[in-house]
């Protein structure tokens, strides 16, 4: 099926390329101005332990209102812009052609990670980069010899944006926001650009794993035919698959007794039972032993549960476990293995009440629901814009993966596409303005390529 889609796609490339409008409608300086306006709004999200809470900072509200007003000011016939109560921004641009073609939903997020300092961001512009070290006032140096900054060696003569070294920059994912809003502007202001329906969703709390929690799957009405998640951090790769992520929680309920009379008094040693449980997981399944397309099992937390008042229950223990896998058969194996581990604990420690809560689907593999034509389309769209990209299996999750897990019936899997962010979640974070312009062209190519696919 994928081969047929590829042949149809290649056969239409000449037509597709001819329909792409000339670039340069939005200047590089305007792109820089847009990106700087976003990163100056401090929109760090808050990482609360509860998976049901959805905290919102003033900065998150501010950037959502800013982008909403920016897009509203662009006008556009039939263009709908919505700012939700949870400060998601939804943009719906209708098709301007008669032919029915697949719709495209682009995604990015407006919040910034809380994992690095994010107050008092002072972006710095380094024009005509000379290929050497970039020394920042905050005392850190961005060097092309550092793996985080190795891509700098490819960008001699370009314009690099950093923080002052005391905070992160916010390129994750305000590069994606800048690219997509520029795409929106070009679609609105250039009626000669023929396209199908294009939608954009900018989410909140992605960097704390909650982007899908308040997404409104009804806001666009119909299910999008394909999704592109503009939040990638590897300039020469795009994802075609990612881990399925399952969260498991195991409770071990104990009671104190004098250990000298432990059997008689039915001593429930929850600590030893929980430790025994963790030790039953084969070490070859630990993340430290896995790579490539191999999944893993990670018992990553052992702690006392909290009562309603927030006080620790010292007799009991909670073990939290991550299951990660690409292949559904491996996932079935992991779940069965953990069931067996639990049964062995129940047999070995009959006085301890050992039980598991319901599994929590954290994110799903995009490969299961991604249309066959998407990977080759993305690769060619990038190539035509001047970027060579290769497929990757992402050992993690994305906004699209979270959406697919929460809304499997209305959200297809979407490729995670490079947004221009580098050294994310750190004070070394940086972006290249010229790359953002190239990425706008790449997203334009995707929009145009869709018109060659039969819906």
Which residues does each predicted region cover?
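Bacterial Sec-dependent N-terminal signal peptides
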Residues: 1-19
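N-terminal capping segment at the start of a domain
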Residues: 26-58, 161-162, 361, 420-426
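A non-catalytic alpha/beta surface segment that caps or lines the substrate-entry region
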Residues: 49-101, 105-107, 111, 122
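Active-site metal-coordination/substrate-binding segment of hydrolases
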Residues: 100-197, 202, 438
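Acidic/histidine-rich catalytic neighborhood of metal-dependent amide-processing enzymes
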Residues: 152-243, 286-311, 319-326, 454-455
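Acidic-enriched catalytic cores of C-N bond-cleaving enzymes acting on peptides and small amides
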Residues: 240, 262-305, 312, 329-354
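Active-site-adjacent substrate-binding region
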Residues: 271-292, 296-300, 362-415
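Zn-dependent metallopeptidase/amidohydrolase metal-coordination segment
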Residues: 315, 389-446, 450
